[in-house]
Amino acid sequence: MQLLQVRTTNTLRRLPGTPLMPSAGAVRVVASVQSGHSWWRMWDGPTGAAEAGSCAEMLRTSAPGTSRPNLSFLLGQVIPLAHTGSVETLPSEESWGCRQRASPLPPSTAPMAVSASHRGGTGTRTWLVDPTLSRDTSPLGGQSWGSPQPSRGA
């Protein structure tokens, strides 16, 4: 299981060349597991009609330097995103991350590219949330990809 965690900001946005989410964008939980994590999907539009493939297991933590127990999310729960120009921000100052499961993703899901804007001034770090990705992404090292990376074994 790999952990892709945003430690320093709550800002999420799409990679260049992909549509930006409108102001009505949100995170919708599409499945839930007993561990306290949840599968979630980013979707576009006020009704969510234009869903963008983006399913991963969500890990929620408090501000950098502190922690809290993982939170369970209800199936179908919608978490709003505030729209600021071309950047989508979560409605709190908590950091968010994505934990990949070894098991297959639920049906009708696809990889999603997520970037985190680092307030420390080191620039934008980007990771690909990809169920087929098995390599060590070393997220805190700032690896950045613009397209899916090939799987390198289990």
Swiss-Prot record:
Annotated region (Disordered), positions in chain: 91-154
Compositional bias per record (Polar residues), positions renumbered to this chain: 134-154
Top-level taxon in the UniProt lineage: Eukaryota
Protein's name in the database: Putative uncharacterized protein FLJ33307
Species: Homo sapiens (Human)
